[in-house]
């Protein structure tokens, strides 16, 4: 299998998000990289599902709550940006204060 650097990066995000979800399912609170991985993976999948940029930006604030993450993590993540592929091309999606 030959993957471009961009495809390798997306795969790494998915693997990190999967590990984070398994830890979350065991009742663990997420750390910074785990929270960012889950949010990023969900945003990429929403774009793949055909949602608009505006819908994804709104959805991005509902993925995790303060109760899902370790103390202080929500305050560390001011925004998450991801280049997502849409039917009409690649666009930068920014979610401000994603953990509420």
From Swiss-Prot:
It catalyses: urea + 2 H2O + H(+) = hydrogencarbonate + 2 NH4(+). It is found in: Cytoplasm. Pathway: Nitrogen metabolism; urea degradation; CO(2) and NH(3) from urea (urease route): step 1/1. It comes from the Bacteria. Keywords: Cytoplasm, Hydrolase. One of its GO terms (cellular component) is cytoplasm. The keyword Cytoplasm applies. It is an enzyme of class 3 (hydrolase). Its EC number is 3.5.1.5. Gene3D superfamilies: Urease, gamma-like subunit (3.30.280.10). GO terms for biological process: urea catabolic process. GO terms for molecular function: nickel cation binding; urease activity. Heterotrimer of UreA (gamma), UreB (beta) and UreC (alpha) subunits. Three heterotrimers associate to form the active enzyme. Belongs to the urease gamma subunit family. HAMAP family: Urease_gamma. This is Urease subunit gamma. The gene is ureA.
């Amino acid at each position: 299998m030959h993957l471009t650097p961009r495809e390798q990066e997306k795969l790494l995000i998915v693997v990190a998000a999967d590990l984070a979800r398994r830890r979350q399912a065991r009742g663990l609170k997420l750390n910074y990289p785990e929270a960012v991985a889950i949010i990023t993976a969900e945003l990429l999948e929403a774009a793949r599902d055909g949602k608009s940029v505006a819908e994804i930006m709104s959805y991005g604030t509902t993925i995790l709550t303060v109760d899902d993450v370790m103390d202080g993590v929500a305050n560390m993540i001011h925004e998450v940006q991801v280049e997502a592929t849409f039917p009409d091309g690649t666009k930068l999606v920014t979610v401000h204060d994603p953990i509420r």
